[in-house]
């Protein structure tokens, strides 16, 4: 079942494109990109979420990430 979001597809796609452009501009390899994005997620959780909710949010984010991974062999 698809998730319902309060954000439009256009908003999400525009922000995603801008973030990807920054990574491409810096010629960031995949491992560096993942490290930076992971640090960004950690920073957002630690600075924007109440301490009592941080672990639950991190677990929810991790589950959403794992469920969105495509397991086909192409890359």
Curated annotation (Swiss-Prot):
InterPro entries: UPF0352, YejL_sf. This is UPF0352 protein YejL. NCBIfam families: PRK13689.1. Belongs to the UPF0352 family. HAMAP family: UPF0352.
């Amino acid at each position: 079942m698809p998730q319902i979001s309060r954000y439009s597809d256009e908003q999400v796609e525009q922000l995603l494109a801008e973030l990807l452009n920054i990574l491409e501009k810096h010629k960031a390899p995949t491992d560096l990109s993942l490290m930076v994005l992971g640090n960004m997620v950690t920073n957002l959780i630690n600075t924007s979420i109440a301490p009592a909710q941080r672990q639950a949010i991190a677990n929810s984010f991790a589950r959403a990430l794992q469920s969105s991974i495509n397991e086909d062999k192409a890359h």
